[in-house]
Amino acid sequence: MKEKILLVDGYNMIAFWQETRQLFKKSELDAARTILLEKLSHYASFEGIRVICVFDAQYMPGIRQTYEEFQVQVVFTAEEETADDYIERLAAELNTPLHQVSVATSDLNEQWTVFAQGALRVS
């Protein structure tokens, strides 16, 4: 059985979710990220999947960071790297017979790129 992995474009999701959109607009990013990660944790537990949530460094400059919070793998990209770039590369790496990769983003260009790599879209 394939391991199901969901890759999430964190700030894209925050900007479009009604529950977090106002926090994003007010630059209350810590609160918005916490809400998103809690929701993703519940979703991961319910679905029995691994979730990797990627945030652009443009909102949190510095070196790439990876850690786990609420049972979700959290990645802040390197300063010159977008979440889209990271997700595209990771989707290609994880697209093996052992994994079923899905991507959650509203970015159409990102969707087409990951479709071409064999990943699925979650909306």
Report each predicted region and the residues it spans:
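Nuclease catalytic cores that cleave nucleic-acid phosphodiester bonds
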Residues: 3-8, 12-123
